Amino acid sequence: MRGSKPMTASALVLTTAWISLAASQALGATLTVKAGESIQAAVKRALPGDRIEVEPGLYKETVFIDKDGIELSGIVRGGQWPVLDGENKLNDGVLVSGHGVTIERLWVKRYKGNGIMTQGSNNYRIAYNVVEGPCFYAIFPQFGKNGLVTHNVAFGSEDAAIYVGMSDNVDVVHNQTYASIIGIESENSHDILIENNYVHDNVVGIATTMLPALPVKSSDRIIIRNNVVARNNMKNTAPPGAITAGAPPGLGILVLGTDHTTVEGNLIRDNDGVGVMVSETNFLVTTPDDRMDPFPDSTQVLRNVFLNNGSNPQGTLRDLLDIAGVK
């Protein structure tokens, strides 16, 4: 390769370590969980790098994964799924703190807090799941790096269906979200890609936000690209006092205080309030935070298709338009 340099001893050691780790994971055991058995019990037996396959059936439990390299994979057979049901009693469906974990092909429903959550987990993959409310967040990666959230269906959330919080380098691609307060949200995060999603029939379609009073004080380099953002006109039922309670229905894409945000190539249609709104944080949040810049800088809105937006703005959005003299 032109311009290449000999590998240093330290690089060779690191490369060898990665190869050894990959080989150990490839040789991991496969554990099978049958209907009536416990997924958590299988996680306890598993070693880092093992694969856990879950047969179709009903599982009423919370699954906590604190080991690295675990693959938790549902088996969908004849239209029958492995279903995790919180029965509106349990707080969380799947909680992950290990690195390199995969969660795929599970139907997760009726957890009061989060359907699938990673916290401090890096290099995770959340794919091909169905996460059904009522819940607060359907899919919630937080405090992690290098994540992939793809080909999921998430709906019925009391806040965001997919919520990427205080994270770096996460791709949210090829998902469908609906019937939630916000379809997809990136909060106080960096290098986030939101692409090729179908986001419809929420209060707000896609939001990238810079919120105060959080440990991460910046949000930068968010790309919202090639999504379909349609009919996000649902009545806002967020509880009083919640930040999202102030979000007016009909917002297609909201850029709230984040820097270097690119909104490009999206089809944005039939959102009654506005197709794309770029605003300082105070539009929704008035909590003071002297360590945070609430103003969005270097936003680009490029080559989007807008159809039939803005026909019935409501709430704070209508108030702003009235002040500006827009009828």
Whereabouts are the PLM-identified features?
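Bacterial N-terminal signal peptides that target proteins for export
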Residues: M1-V13
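Bacterial N-terminal signal peptides
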Residues: S10-A22
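Right-handed parallel beta-helix/beta-solenoid
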Residues: S24-A41, R45
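Right-handed parallel beta-helix/beta-spiral solenoid domain characteristic of secreted/periplasmic
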Residues: A29-A35, R51, P56, G69-K112
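Short, T/G/N/S-enriched strand-turn elements that build extracellular solenoid repeat scaffolds
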Residues: I39-R45, K60-K67, M117, S218, ...
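Short glycine/acidic-rich loop motifs that flank beta-strands on beta-rich extracellular proteins
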Residues: Y59-I65, W81-V83, E87-G93, K112-T118, ...
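Right-handed parallel beta-helix
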Residues: S73-I75, W81, H99-R110, N122-F136, ...
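Extracellular beta-rich repeat passengers
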Residues: N196, L211, N226, A238-K327
